[in-house]
């Protein structure tokens, strides 16, 4: 009789745990998760075929909407709202499933970033990092850190972007993801350059190129070429630009390469060649900054050759584009400064929350151990 009572005492919590979701439709999500890394389109198709989602348990519903959001994000489906991923964040916030909790907050950040809500995106990304040390999904951590770094660079707060971008490089290195490292190193190099560390920027781009293999990313070659031109390494810069041009897929992507190539020819006193590429930028580049760069270099050439009327005309065109760019940047800067102070408040609050959560977890663990000791002691006392 006593043995039966002991058995029931052990069995009751097991039955209670296993009853979660009882009476609800259950789904095996493993096939979807296996498809997600390489075939997110197939994963999305499977998820969309699931019917009666309202009959899912709360746990399965959270898992479903997390996977659905991930598949949509990876297949570039336009996000309209964060209401579905909120079902996942609300559920996982109450659990100890750290990786899914972090992933849910990350995708909530991604959606809000796409919806042009950078303040909310930053908040959710930082929430995803609250228990960073205990998460081993380096692909997820790399994306979170890289996105936070990117948001800081948009604000031109480069010193705050730097540590997150360094973490992103390390996360992708731990994962042995070469292309992840390439993109993270490129972004890190840009930040180093904006902070005035040209040597560090060169090293980042050199490392990125060494990791590429056959998967050429033209922008890295172009940016390294620009850095080499500053150091008068013109022959090396020319080789990099040729590689960049040979690997461009979209026609409009050639203009940033043309701008650097025009600057190289100008430095090398090959004025006709310089004018050809710079004029193409001034007339046809889709981005105002690239057009402005072409006009500025052409203006400098005209002044050097004492072509005063041409120089005046180019100067007028350049200043017109520059003024419109500066007005846009000033408006953006005001928004960014306001956001930056808000980000600081959020970051401080979330780091305090992380510390509090860590302390609470410690006390919770102690209380669980204490309860187990008391339970075992009670069982042995009862048996005796």
Protein language model features and the residues they cover:
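N-terminal leader/linker segments that initiate helical-solenoid repeat arrays
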Residues: 19-70, 74, 79-82, 94, ...
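Alpha-helical solenoid scaffolds that mediate protein-protein interactions
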Residues: 43, 49-50, 88, 95, ...
